[in-house]
């Protein structure tokens, strides 16, 4: 996005957002509010889209679901109007992740497909890689392993043409880790081995902590299926010792959930509860009932395994209450999606109409006013 046309104050706000988005949430949110307010005053969809997007990104990192959904849906509308396609695709990606977490894979897939379409239309290969990897994870969640592999492999093929991109190594780890997990879940353990070896190649210790923990989770599942108790438990302890108190819960929930399912089959109860104690408050804070239900299901499995009947019944009662509330949430989510799609469709129709009108005017300007013949030969 280019911002040279704006005054010094606006450019300073934008610079502050981009420089601090990973380190200072309060400062970024304050600048985003200023940018949105100025954008409203000047009827500037580009500024409003920018402010809503980066504000939404911060709320995503803070696990603040209510503000995230509002900001990101607003961002999508304004960015589409401003024709800022890279951020439009990133909006679709965020909303796809959130919809999947809410338990609506069909809606998530719709967001991802729109993101893929715009990635192809506007030649955005790195954004396409991002969408393809998350589509692969969606298929993985749904047990569509062939589709999952194909999506990951398509992302890999594009990635090989972008080896100098700053995100190349990040996406390579995502590809190898997710492919390994996909193969492991199908019990194709020998095929998964070379992917795991890549993840542990020289220098992997320099990978970000969250990514190292993801690799440890894949190792836990792999060694559990291999029956290697010692290596499995070593990986479990790595997670237990290094798990931070705060995670971006939507980015990692499915991985930790699958890890917990493995832990329920072991005697590693302390590590199981360590993970639950970290993810549960963040899931509650994000206000995604579907994930709260999954956490409760882990607790119920544990209580049943250890014959803790009173705790099991209490959790079951809460599970029932949340299930009823989740139905209303799903209806509201679909209603919001329908409204958003109508708004985007209306804007795109208006844009196409304007483009056709401009084309007609251009053709007329290129014709002799007397003969109506083209002046260009």
Question: What function would you assign to each model-found segment?
Answer:
Residues 1-8:
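TPR-adjacent "capping" and linker segments in tetratricopeptide-repeat scaffold/adaptor proteins
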Residues 362-377:
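Conserved nucleotide-binding and Mg2+-coordinating catalytic segments in signaling enzymes
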